[in-house]
Amino acid sequence: LVGSEMCIRDSYYRTDALMLSGETAYGKYPVEAVKTMTKVAAQAEKDKLPDNDIRIPLDENSNDVTAFLAKQAVKATTKLKIRAIITDSYSGRTARNLAAFRGKYPVLAICYKEKTMRHLALSYGVEAIYMPELANGQEYYFAALRRLLQEGRLQPTDMVGYLSSGKAGTQTSFLEINVVEDALKHANESVLPNCNRYL
């Protein structure tokens, strides 16, 4: 029971993932134990209390642009009507940075690699989605928006934050905030030919 009590407490402190102890999992009622912990975790997600947040300060001397932008994106969800934060991801680093700040709305990580998608499955608040890379980075973002709309993860009137880099293979360098339908309305004007990213 002690392991289960710890899982419950950890749920309220917004842990990334839960793992039942061997004793619980191999006990008389392993399926019931998993079902119960699933219910508890789901309820804990609904009952989020700001007091349970563990503050993650940024070092004043840090030059970590990704962490800075991730924190600002999560902060923006408390000031604006942002319903999701989208990031495209090779390694999952930006999505994990976003998860660290424990935002209220989901992080939709559009992953270039299936392996990255699997790794992000354990990150708090991250919904990892695999989508093969396109030649044009801007078109990748617009294709992701269309897919998220089609799957019902976003609505046309939703405001979203988007974190990405200006150049493939470099760290996150910008945060863009748009209403989905407005971004898509101007997609054809925004996509530059032979452009890997925005720069």
Annotate each predicted stretch with a short phrase.
Residues 9-30:
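Glycine-rich phosphate-binding active-site loops on the catalytic face of alpha/beta enzymes
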